[in-house]
């Protein structure tokens, strides 16, 4: 076992018991809590709802904050690979604290220079410069503090807490602005609380300690020498790795859409919700609430959700809900429906955000991770900068009148991204679109509901005739195999009564399953099995033919699997399944939660049976050898889990 693997085993199973992760998690949440406090105050200082172009003001502020991510993203990524990520984040927090704390003096001074609306944009640009260094350092540090199988949950937890902070920040920021307008407090309290949040974040980050259990001490870390060569390597890595490039492009589309939706919220709030600053914070907070909810759902599902399925659902839902928001604005459908639309946009946006981070963290080596995140930040933030720049830089009169058109184009852009993602995920896939999509759903079911965990690699070859033989424990066994053998469709031998059922039969015919009448098998079953193997298919079979409760003796293997193996010469791959809960009805077993363990083995050696084609005992003996190989896998699984 490698040093990195041994270190990973020492990390806690529960993320909340990992002190380093909890400190990073809490620091990000607290800093997010202060983010919109200053933004709402600056928006009011620039004129806010009293202007007919509130969309332009919001877009300009968003543009100024994210522009440094585009300009400095690759450099910040190089910095995260070259210098301490922890101290980079602490320094970024303390500098942003200084910037926010000085706003009561700097904003009036900038207005005195006759900078117009840029007087509220420049302080945000200054804060964005150091946020651009904070982001790749944080994202690159996460995998060094946790196990690989915790990436989805960790990123979802970080996203959820960050968006909860954003919800409270937007609501509190708007409420404080309303109080300041009423004369109860001074507007400067928005800036002071924002500065305080960065101080608290820095204190928490300072508590992160690199001990023996931290993977960052044991994973070889190549120091990125120089500046320009490492920067070029970051771009080259993204260009060479198609999966990383694709997910960054999808993140780019999401952030362009997010920039437009965030920019139009003040106009929507004024026209539909009455024009209060607290309303603006609350309804903008609904997007953040949706992001938090989506992240919480991903935390619950964890790695069970296949990335392609998650991305497709996020793009489809995002596009449709943006159009629904457009319809709410045009048809005056009211506050409740509009709020639901904003919330659901956030829910589906979480799917994109978390998947972007997880894929980069999972596939990119630690020594290059910061630079790749820098490229990702540059690309995704370029999208939001371009989108908001087109709205905020030109002085478009009565821009708010064009909000329905902006939302319509945004929804169409997300659906076009959906079509692109579908084409890329389907590229080179030998299965029909229906089979592929159902397979993704089966993988989600097996991973989440059955809590399946595969021990070792799947040994089923990608091509050629194969008999996949497994012990039979429950009605979910076929779905468990389909969920863990992700590169081949397994065609199972199934009972005729299930094959003839309306919905189940349709699914079985798609997978080319072979029906058999248990009372009267007939020759058609054998002929269809031989034909499938002759065509190079993968035949799934349960040698025992049935399953029984755990307290009853395990059935012995029947001769059918041995006869097929000897007659066709197909490779036989053993598979052992454990951890299912017994139910007499296969239908009932689908709704019971399991904790399944699956192990695939090496091909079964049946060379001892060559030349015994006429021996009537050979099929039964071969079946016994196959069943023995399956049981041996069970002993290996029990030993490793002990």
Kindly give the residue locations of the regions a language model identified.
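Helix-loop junctions on the cytosolic side of multi-pass membrane transporters
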Residues: 140, 144, 191-223, 304, ...
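Non-catalytic C-terminal accessory region of glycerolipid acyltransferases
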Residues: 434-437, 441, 524-642
